[in-house]
A protein has these predicted regions:
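Short, well-ordered coil/turn residues at beta-beta hairpins
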Residues: 90-91, 111
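Short internal beta-strands
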Residues: 22, 41, 45-60
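N-terminal beta-loop-helix "entrance" segment that forms/cooperates
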Residues: 52-74
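Short acidic low-complexity segments
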Residues: 72-84
């Protein structure tokens, strides 16, 4: 994650300029990854964000709830609470059980693969949310860094 200048992001001592970020547990079969590590959560908290992590969202990737709490994130009990954030970070495209969480004031960052999942495209369109597909993010050279092998 690129470091942003903190003083340009804060609007006041009590109001985070970047708002609330939610990380729900992935529900797609066999998906164990999580969209945000505890270190990433700590960086966002330091920039003034409130970070909501659904209980056990990081467990499949080896991150405990306690690790997120130590980073300054808050653990929430339900997906609904994580999805209530202004910005939601996920790994996989929204599943049918998550479509009701999509709404006009939501920004979603995740892999979308819309050509393979037309029902997701339809749900996103009808919800009015703003969605960014990781697989389409390019750098200055036109390279797709989020598709590079880890």
């Amino acid at each position: 994650m690129r470091k942003l200048r903190q003083n340009s992001l804060m609007t006041s001592a009590t109001t985070p300029a970047l708002g609330v970020i939610g990380v729900p547990k992935e529900i797609k079969g066999d998906e164990r990854r999580v969209a945000l590590t505890p270190d990433g959560a700590a960086e966002l908290v330091q920039m003034g964000c409130q970070v909501l992590i659904e209980h056990d969202a990081g467990r499949g990737s080896g991150f405990s709830d306690e690790m997120y709490v130590s980073s300054g994130a808050q653990i929430v009990a339900t997906a609904k609470e994580a999805w209530s954030a202004e910005l939601v970070l996920k790994v996989k495209e929204p599943q049918a059980g998550e479509f009701d969480f999509l709404r006009p004031d939501l920004t979603l960052f995740t892999y979308l693969h819309l050509a393979a999942y037309p029902k997701v495209a339809t749900a996103l369109k009808h919800s009015g949310c703003t969605a960014f597909a990781y697989e389409t993010v390019t750098d200055r050279n036109g390279v797709l860094p989020l598709l590079a092998p880890m």
